[in-house]
Structure formats: structure tokens, C-alpha cells
Amino acid sequence: MAVLIPAAGGGRRLGGRPKQFRALGEHPVLVQVLLSFERHPAVGHAVVAAPESRVTDVTDRLQAEGLSVLTAVVGGGADRQSSVQHALRAVPDPVNTVLVHDAARPFVAAAQVQAVVQAVRTGGAASLVVPVADTLRRGDADRLGETVSRDGLYRMQTPQGFRREWLEHAHRRASAEDLAATDDVALVQHLDHDVAPVPGSRRNFKITTPDDWALAQALWPTWRDAPERFDLSSSASS
């Protein structure tokens, strides 16, 4: 099994240095993500899509960490979708299951990864999700409108997992049809494949804003000392 890490984004909403290269504890966020997957026995390969101008630097840094799971660092594309495409091409041939995980989502627990893996083995595609908890309303800049039902609404997380041939086909179709999507689930659903929802955790958040970064720094000591506390027992219902 392989995990693809699209890490070529610039982190404009957070500002400053791209979030995946900021230090969280003793290592950059990207390294913490890779360490999470290195601890999982089913994951044998990791491919990172880095900024094109930083491929050599990122390769040197990751190799210096002694990460046995690291297979390749490739140049990313102009957006997340193209970065996943580039990383997918570097996956070794024998691999038939592929996970895609955000480079700025460091608090993914082993039990959550395993749940996605099992769902992919059963049905072919799966993603971590968290039910929407907040009240939702339509509206514009001037006034609030009606409440939107939260029933059946989910916030998408990663990892998202797929049979390799499904994901490859989905990206080929997207390129042929000039289809853009914000995650790989949408591309696979475009092929009429079902994607299984797997309970995620609110702690498995993506670092996007300054508030997210502050929260990540606050949670880091707990994750460092006892990452099992972040497993499915700390899921969206908690």
C-alpha cells in the first residue's frame, strides 16, 4: 500500500512559511505526517509531491530523517489535483491500494488509517468524515437566511483511500474532461463508484489558518506523549 502526500501548496491563508514545512515539535509538519504512516504496518510506500523548486531540498531533508517509508519526492503541480497525479505516477507497480493524505494534517491516528484501509479492501473507496455539528444558514453579506439541515452533511478529511486502478482512471478522466475537484473522492464518484464514509475525528484537522496553527501547537504535547488518545475513541461524536 502507498500513501500520496500532496505538499506543494503555498499556505497563503496561514501566511509566512508553508505550513507543511513549519516545525511542530522536533520535526516539520510534513515529517510528522510521514512518521504517522511509517508506524502503520500496511503502508510500505510514501510519495511526496513537493514544490517543483524545492524537490532537491525536500528530498535531502526527508532522507536525513531516515524514513524507511519514503519512496520518492516528485515535483508537484499547479494545484492539489495535479500534485496527486504526479505522485500517483511514482507509485511502484505492485501496489494496488493508494491513500491520499493532506500534508498539513498531522494528527491522524493509526486506528483511523486502519479503518480506511479496511473499508477500501471491502468496497474499493473510502474517506474519513466528520458529521457537521454547527448550525448552518444560508445568507449573504447583508443578512442571514434560512437554516440548512445538517442531516447527511459531512466535513471531509483524509486519508482517502482507493483501489489504485480506480484512482488512476479517475484522474485520467478528469484530465480528459478538464474536471477540477477539491478532493479525490469527487473524482472517483464521477466514475459512479461508491465511497464509504469512515468516522473521523475533529482532532484530525487540517492546519490552514493561524488559529489552526495555534491549536496544533497546543495539542502537540498530547500527541507526542500518547498518540493513541487520538484514535477512533476520540471520534467526531466526542
Curated annotation (Swiss-Prot):
Keywords: Isoprene biosynthesis, Nucleotidyltransferase, Transferase. SUPFAM superfamilies: Nucleotide-diphospho-sugar transferases. PROSITE patterns: ISPD. It comes from the Bacteria. Its EC number is 2.7.7.60. It is an enzyme of class 2 (transferase). GO terms for biological process: isopentenyl diphosphate biosynthetic process, methylerythritol 4-phosphate pathway. One of its GO terms (molecular function) is 2-C-methyl-D-erythritol 4-phosphate cytidylyltransferase activity. It catalyses: 2-C-methyl-D-erythritol 4-phosphate + CTP + H(+) = 4-CDP-2-C-methyl-D-erythritol + diphosphate. CDD domains: CDP-ME_synthetase. The record marks 13, 19 as: Transition state stabilizer. It holds the Pfam family IspD. InterPro entries: IspD, IspD/TarI, IspD/TarI_cytidylyltransf_bact, ISPD_synthase_CS, Nucleotide-diphossugar_trans. Pathway: Isoprenoid biosynthesis; isopentenyl diphosphate biosynthesis via DXP pathway; isopentenyl diphosphate from 1-deoxy-D-xylulose 5-phosphate: step 2/6. The record marks 150, 206 as: Positions MEP for the nucleophilic attack. HAMAP family: IspD. PANTHER family: 2-C-METHYL-D-ERYTHRITOL 4-PHOSPHATE CYTIDYLYLTRANSFERASE, CHLOROPLASTIC (PTHR32125:SF4). Belongs to the IspD/TarI cytidylyltransferase family. IspD subfamily. Catalyzes the formation of 4-diphosphocytidyl-2-C-methyl-D-erythritol from CTP and 2-C-methyl-D-erythritol 4-phosphate (MEP). This is 2-C-methyl-D-erythritol 4-phosphate cytidylyltransferase. The lineage of its organism: Bacteria, Pseudomonadati, Rhodothermota, Rhodothermia, Rhodothermales. The gene is ispD.
